[in-house]
């Protein structure tokens, strides 16, 4: 297993039952950017696509957003995100960290215009979920 204190590439996930946002980042520079949005079938991730992305980027760490209520308590999606993190840990030889994602979607919506400042950009495949994954990853990078 790779060292959590590495300076390599890290991958972040914004887990959802319909969509999973994916972002890629660099621990050395503490930067993160949205990568893609994956479709889920009834809450089941597309593991083949996740494996393909993993093989392309070879991240040293996975960071999964932990969806908590505003007061910090868990909600039904929290359990599903934890299960997703456990599955990642079982399927891939890299550490998996969970990171509080409260307000990440709100921040992603604010950042949306950074990526979609005109109609041409609005047709891009990068969606709010991928931007939220980038927000989660950037927050984790800043705290790690």
UniProtKB/Swiss-Prot annotation:
Question: One GO BP annotation here?
Answer: rRNA 5'-end processing
Tell me where in or outside the cell this protein is found.
Answer: Cytoplasm
In short, the EC number is 3.1.-.-
Task: Quote the cellular component terms of the Gene Ontology held in the record.
Answer: cytosol
Name the InterPro entries on file. Answer: RNaseH-like_sf, YqgF, YqgF/RNaseH-like_dom, YqgF/RNaseH-like_dom_sf
Identify the SMART domains for this entry. Answer: YqgFc
The protein's UniProt keywords, in alphabetical order, are: Cytoplasm, Hydrolase, Nuclease, Ribosome biogenesis
Q: What class of enzyme is it?
A: hydrolase
S-S bonds: none
Q: Does the keyword Cytoplasm apply?
A: yes
**Full protein name:** Putative pre-16S rRNA nuclease
Molecular-function annotations in GO: nuclease activity
Q: Which CDD domains match?
A: YqgF
Q: What does this protein do?
A: Could be a nuclease involved in processing of the 5'-end of pre-16S rRNA.
Q: Give any Pfam family that matches.
A: RuvX
Q: Where in the sequence is the signal peptide annotated?
A: none
Taxonomic superkingdom: Bacteria
Q: Which family does it belong to?
A: Belongs to the YqgF nuclease family.
Q: What is the lineage of its organism?
A: Bacteria, Pseudomonadati, Pseudomonadota, Gammaproteobacteria, Enterobacterales
Task: Tell me if GTP-binding is a UniProt keyword of this record.
Answer: no
